[in-house]
């Protein structure tokens, strides 16, 4: 395998000494190792299409060996996921991944098809997928974590579910040390910080609580927080930027520095454009698309929000205030999802924006492509977007 990955060839004499291993899963004329190297060089955007070829291809695309080869070849890339929760459905959320459509023929006369970006959301059949909440999902490496969720949202939970994005299977990880209500998760240095409300034994009141989950050791511990934070306003949302965990409590933000184990109240500027619940961190920069549908980024040096400017000749997406918007880090780019209603159905749109920092106080965005990627029934629903690395 190492020789194939490095591009070396095997001499005919060695081939005679060693019986060639025949693939029983794909092409009978090719060895398994060679097939793995070939598929590993293909962009992960085409994997949903390849999975339709046969059951053997689906098995190959889910094998850990394939992703080991991708890592050896330096072919690791981000894979964008969308989890859609439809409140009228009782079978759990639906999962989709961004992929490329099959190549269109050059003889196509469909003008609308010719203008298409070529991207689409493909549904992933994931059996027994647990329910999710707005802020219960976090991606670390090739895994997506779903934390503190129950079938009934008004109940507390300490559950930790892990989705292996290689095989698209769920497994249950060790539970948190405490049960939490209304969780919000954020990632910093391969660790997941879980903020939520906790009810102490023998008490009727709920207090803020923070638990850190080490994704490498799968060990979680509670973080000691000041009384003013635990008994103050409820932690609505959280994020991680500037090497700190940022907790929005009421109309103020409290920062936790895990290196120093210290807490600091930093005012209310950061949370000004976070209450729309439409924000994400890309390249250690916090981006937001608030209810006014203006794209902004947070300057941690001077603690102020700045507008995301567009490159000359370009234009950022214009979104309706009524649209449900979700942002995600897509390999260092900003992925934007929003919906538009059309009759009994609605279209889910996606735009990918490349980001370029010109100086300390200016970031420019360039829309690489924008297109509708999915049709779903027009029913009450919400969706989360996030990306794993495979």
UniProtKB/Swiss-Prot annotation:
Disulfide bonds: none annotated. Residues 24-70 form the F-box domain. It comes from the Eukaryota. Pfam families: F-box, Kelch_FKB95. InterPro entries: F-box-like_dom_sf (IPR036047), F-box/kelch-repeat_ARATH (IPR050354), F-box_dom (IPR001810), Kelch-typ_b-propeller (IPR015915). Kelch repeats lie at residues 143-190, 237-284, 286-330. Keywords: Kelch repeat, Repeat. Residues 1-27 are annotated as: Disordered. This is F-box/kelch-repeat protein At4g25710. The lineage of its organism: Eukaryota, Viridiplantae, Streptophyta, Embryophyta, Tracheophyta.
């Amino acid at each position: 395998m190492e020789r194939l990955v490095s591009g070396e060839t095997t001499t005919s004499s060695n081939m005679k000494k060693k019986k060639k291993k025949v693939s029983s899963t794909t092409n009978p004329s090719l060895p398994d190792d060679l097939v793995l190297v070939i598929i590993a060089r293909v962009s992960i955007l085409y994997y949903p299409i390849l999975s339709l070829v046969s059951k053997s291809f689906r098995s190959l695309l889910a094998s850990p060996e394939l992703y080991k080869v991708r890592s050896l070849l330096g072919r690791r890339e981000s894979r964008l996921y969308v989890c859609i929760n439809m409140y009228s459905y009782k079978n759990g959320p639906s999962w989709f991944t961004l992929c490329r459509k099959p190549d269109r023929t050059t003889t196509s006369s469909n003008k609308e098809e010719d203008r298409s970006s070529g991207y689409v959301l493909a549904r992933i059949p994931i059996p027994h997928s647990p329910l999710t909440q707005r802020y219960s999902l976090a991606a670390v490496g090739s895994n997506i974590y779903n934390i503190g969720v129950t079938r009934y949202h008004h109940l507390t939970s300490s559950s930790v579910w892990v989705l292996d994005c290689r095989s698209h299977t769920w497994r249950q990880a060790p539970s948190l040390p405490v049960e939490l209500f209304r969780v919000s998760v954020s990632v910093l240095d391969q660790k997941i910080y879980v903020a939520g409300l906790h009810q102490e034994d023998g008490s009727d009141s709920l207090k803020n609580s923070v638990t850190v989950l080490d994704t490498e050791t799968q060990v979680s511990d509670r973080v000691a927080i000041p009384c003013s934070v635990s008994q103050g306003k409820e932690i609505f949302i959280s994020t991680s930027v500037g090497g700190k965990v940022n907790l929005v409590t009421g109309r103020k933000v409290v920062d936790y520095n895990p290196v120093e184990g210290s807490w600091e109240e930093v005012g209310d500027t950061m949370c000004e454009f976070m209450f729309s619940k439409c924000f994400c961190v890309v390249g250690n920069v916090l981006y937001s698309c608030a209810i006014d549908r203006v794209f902004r980024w947070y300057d941690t040096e001077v603690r102020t929000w700045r507008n995301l400017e567009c490159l000359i000749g370009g234009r950022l997406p214009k979104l309706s205030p009524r649209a449900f918007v979700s942002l995600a880090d897509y390999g260092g780019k900003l992925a934007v999802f929003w919906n538009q209603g059309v009759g009994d159905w609605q279209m889910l749109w996606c735009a990918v924006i490349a980001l370029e920092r010109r100086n300390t106080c200016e970031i420019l965005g360039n829309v690489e492509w924008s297109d509708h990627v999915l049709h779903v029934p027009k029913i009450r629903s919400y969706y989360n977007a996030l990306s794993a690395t495979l």
